[in-house]
């Protein structure tokens, strides 16, 4: 009798074994790949991060613009830190056509007169009238040393002679890059280019930080 060969069915592929569970300490068994979940937490469910607030200076500095802020002319700024004050510029502004009978407009000196014992000096950036024009009227209230470059001091002296104040005022001639110590302030004059010679800006260093004071149209020279 002829023998017949049975048709055996093809072997089925084995189902992939289930991945072994991770150990209690979070390690993955040898031979297994560590996969990250594909689902992510919706953005709106995330906890918002608190914005970092700027750190306040341990020693604050106060700036009082008595003129020249939002206007052209009458430049005068007072800086206060650690109980010390300095003044930068003391100018005037000429009246417009609607100010009949007014020759000039000067800053209100009430604040500086009330704090005259704290003021260490008056620093002048350059010799334009909107920066030096009110100095005689301030020095009539009380005396204080005036710091400026050679040309600037010369222009101020000529102005003070008309008021009889030139011999009563102490002038300190400053040179760019030579620092001046006034109370807690250290002021460095910086040579700048302006429409009048011998103009400077000031780098005013204090325990609260450094501030650059200059005229609005000045540009630095290297």
Regions found by a protein language model. Give the residues of each.
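Intrinsically disordered, low-complexity RNA-associated tracts
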Residues: 1-55
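His/Asp/Glu-rich metal-coordinating catalytic cores
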Residues: 42-123, 128-220
């Amino acid at each position: 009798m002829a023998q017949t060969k049975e048709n055996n069915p093809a072997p089925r592929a084995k189902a992939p074994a289930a991945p072994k569970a991770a150990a209690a300490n979070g390690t993955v068994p040898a031979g297994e790949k560590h996969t990250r979940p594909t689902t992510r937490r919706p953005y709106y469910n995330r906890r918002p991060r608190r914005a970092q607030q700027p750190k306040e200076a341990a020693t604050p500095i106060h700036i009082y613009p008595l003129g020249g802020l939002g206007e052209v002319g009458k430049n005068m700024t007072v800086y206060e830190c650690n109980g010390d004050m300095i003044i930068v510029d003391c100018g005037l502004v000429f009246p417009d056509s609607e100010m009949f009978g007014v020759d000039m407009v000067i800053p209100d000196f009430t604040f500086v007169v009330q704090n005259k014992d704290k003021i260490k000096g008056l620093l002048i950036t350059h010799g334009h009238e909107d920066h030096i024009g009110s100095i005689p009227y301030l020095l009539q209230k009380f005396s204080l040393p005036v710091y400026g470059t050679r040309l600037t001091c010369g222009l101020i002296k000529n102005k003070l002679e008309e008021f009889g104040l030139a011999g009563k005022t102490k002038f300190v001639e400053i040179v760019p890059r030579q620092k001046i110590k006034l109370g807690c302030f250290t002021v460095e004059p910086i040579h700048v280019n302006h429409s009048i010679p011998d103009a400077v800006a000031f780098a005013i260093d204090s325990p609260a930080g450094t501030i650059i004071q200059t005229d609005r149209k000045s540009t630095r020279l290297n």
